Amino acid sequence: MEKIEISTETIQLDQLLKLAGAVPTGGAVKPLLEEKRILVNGVPETARRKKLVPGDVVSLQMEEGEKHYKVVLY
């Protein structure tokens, strides 16, 4: 599981995935959400701008396998 450090209390889901290098742009998150390939704390997420807090775990189901990111405070 890759840890993504943030220096604020929250981060939006699309921003986190951009920061992690999982997507090239925030807009690239939309089709992944529509296909229910993004889970937040084990639950399928539909909101691109979902606010994440330290401790949240984001799972991204890609063709090459699953990637997991944990939000941690910097």
Predicted regions and their residues:
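A basic, amphipathic helix-loop patch mediating RNA/tRNA/ribosome contacts
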Residues: 11-54
